[in-house]
Amino acid sequence: MKPFGQRLGRFSVKTLLTGLLGLALTLPAVASDTPDLDTIKERGTLRVGMSTFVPWAMRDKQGELIGFEIDVAKRLAADSGWQVEFVPTAWDGIIPALLAKKFDVIIGGMSVTPERSKSVLFTAPYSHSGVQLAASKKLAEGFSKLEDFNKRNVKIAARRGAFTVQVARETFPKASVLQFDDDAQAFQEVINGNAHAVIASSPKPEHESIKHSDSLFLPFSERLSKGNEAFAVRLGEEDKKAYFDQWIADRTADGWLQARYEYWFSTLDWQDQIASGQ
């Protein structure tokens, strides 16, 4: 029988070699599956996951995508020498689609939240908006306080999978929250008199209350919440985050992001461009 030390040494070397071989076989597969910054540069195209909601991203009368997020993604790609490919995705499935590598980054007005940060890596914020409520003049007549909407017979509409659903549930825990695939459907539910109010990212409630002043009003002068929007990439993609952070810093410093935000969020100069039903 061989000494214990000799047997242990041989076993350890064999085990080590086996482990290193397995690691060597695994690493290339992991690297090739990760569309990191170098892969985007080689491809020459940035694939952007987004969802349509006014004025972040929407269709014009020719069917082309326009909006704040579209401007941001196009400028990012142009500054980087890339093409841009937009991947329209249902909002409630946009994070799973990112994790499934359907695209490289989410640029879609996504608010930074602790819960989302468990699944994705956020960049520095590139815009700062918030959430507001528009109410039905018919069903919510005389409502002016938060507690007026926090009742069991009150129905509040919101876009499925959006941060607004969380705001609705936390602010009005007694009310029923009705979820729809997009903001347009949620607002239409209130306009039709089937819900007391709709919660959406500003300035959608403000704009819709002006457009439909006969049926909608803003009961609160202050927004329900203020938030930060950021790009989202997959956890561990620090190279992409650093690159995007620098771009955001540059476009913030030269005033471009603020100028585009003010155009899309503080004016209605673009309104005659968009297709109906959005």
Residue map of PLM features:
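Short helix-initiation/N-cap motifs at beta->coil->alpha
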Residues: 70, 86-96, 141, 178-192, ...
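Periplasmic-binding protein-like
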Residues: 128-132, 202, 206-248, 267-278
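Short loop->beta-strand "edge-of-pocket" segments that line small-molecule binding or catalytic clefts
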Residues: 44-52, 146-161, 176
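Flexible hinge/capping segments at coil-to-helix
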Residues: 37, 136-154
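A ligand-binding cleft/hinge motif common to bilobed small-molecule-binding domains
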Residues: 93, 109-118, 167-170, 191-192, ...
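Extracytoplasmic small-molecule ligand-binding "clamshell" domains
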Residues: 32-109, 118
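Hydrophobic/proline-rich hinge and linker segments of small-molecule sensing/allosteric domains
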Residues: 48-51, 122-144, 231-234
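Ligand-binding clefts/hinges and TM-proximal coupling segments of bilobed small-molecule sensing domains
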Residues: 33-34, 163-177, 219, 248-278
